[in-house]
Amino acid sequence: MTVGKSSKMLQHIDYRMRCILQDGRIFIGTFKAFDKHMNLILCDCDEFRKIKPKNSKQAEREEKRVLGLVLLRGENLVSMTVEGPPPKDTGIARVPLAGAAGGPGIGRAAGRGIPAGVPMPQAPAGLAGPVRGVGGPSQQVMTPQGRGTVAAAAAAATASIAGAPTQYPPGRGGPPPPMGRGAPPPGMMGPPPGMRPPMGPPMGIPPGRGTPMGMPPPGMRPPPPGMRGPPPPGLRPPRP
């Protein structure tokens, strides 16, 4: 359908139209759309029909029904007439135009989080968390490091939590070696891995002379007062 032939129909868009059907019903609604088969779309439509009385003495009565949005088939349409002008609010844009002046309100997104410039709220006294650096690893240990220092950082964190001795700064050497547990002399094999080395003689006693008189060997409890301890190695106990 060309626009020239339907220009008269386009001029009646948004008008209140009265449509009469073949069965005598009347539809009055706002004319919104049509096609080449004269199928119509009416909104806010009302139906009016005449009901014949059972008794010939009574007059015909008209019944009204509110239908709303209606799709009317063109094959049932007999005539269309203008019932009234378009509503006044038809030309009002539902969406604000680009150059239209705005009102007093300001459209903005819903607030999420804390806006910039607002001071952070402080916890009440007694409810705050531990002070930074107390109750956990130090700030130096928690600082991100390279891949090669992950193991060193983990060891330092374990030592700081377990209360190990103070760490020595790099370049000044480590802690002194323990006394009495040096490397084995040349020509002798050390203890296998996982075993403690044998206890050496106490400091101040030359090797090879055993324990002094009156002192029990390592690992034995001293005798009670008034009793003599066991004889040193290499000496026989006196006969009674």
Curated annotation (Swiss-Prot):
Role noted for this protein: Plays a role in pre-mRNA splicing as a core component of the spliceosomal U1, U2, U4 and U5 small nuclear ribonucleoproteins (snRNPs), the building blocks of the spliceosome. Component of both the pre-catalytic spliceosome B complex and activated spliceosome C complexes. As a component of the minor spliceosome, involved in the splicing of U12-type introns in pre-mRNAs. As part of the U7 snRNP it is involved in histone pre-mRNA 3'-end processing.
UniProt biased composition (Pro residues): 172-205, 214-240
Coiled-coil segments: none
Modified residues (Asymmetric dimethylarginine): 108, 112
Protein name listed in UniProt: Small nuclear ribonucleoprotein-associated protein B'
Post-translational modification: Methylated by PRMT5. Arg-108 and Arg-112 are dimethylated, probably to asymmetric dimethylarginine.
Domain called Sm: residue spans: 4-86
Family named by the database record: Belongs to the snRNP SmB/SmN family.
Keywords: Cytoplasm, Methylation, mRNA processing, mRNA splicing, Nucleus, Repeat, Ribonucleoprotein, RNA-binding, Spliceosome
Span list, region Repeat-rich region: 175-236
Region (Disordered): 163-240
Omega-N-methylarginine modifications at: 108, 112, 147, 172
Organism of origin: Erinaceus europaeus
Single GO molecular function: RNA binding
Chain positions with Dimethylated arginine modification: 108, 112
Localization terms from the record: Cytoplasm, Cytosol; Nucleus
Subunit (UniProt): Core component of the spliceosomal U1, U2, U4 and U5 small nuclear ribonucleoproteins (snRNPs), the building blocks of the spliceosome. Most spliceosomal snRNPs contain a common set of Sm proteins, SNRPB, SNRPD1, SNRPD2, SNRPD3, SNRPE, SNRPF and SNRPG that assemble in a heptameric protein ring on the Sm site of the small nuclear RNA to form the core snRNP. Component of the U1 snRNP. The U1 snRNP is composed of the U1 snRNA and the 7 core Sm proteins SNRPB, SNRPD1, SNRPD2, SNRPD3, SNRPE, SNRPF and SNRPG, and at least three U1 snRNP-specific proteins SNRNP70/U1-70K, SNRPA/U1-A and SNRPC/U1-C.
Major subcellular location class: cytoplasm
Sequence repeat feature ranges: 175-181, 191-196, 216-221, 222-228, 230-236
GO-annotated biological processes: mRNA splicing, via spliceosome; spliceosomal snRNP assembly
Source superkingdom: Eukaryota
Keyword RNA-binding found: yes
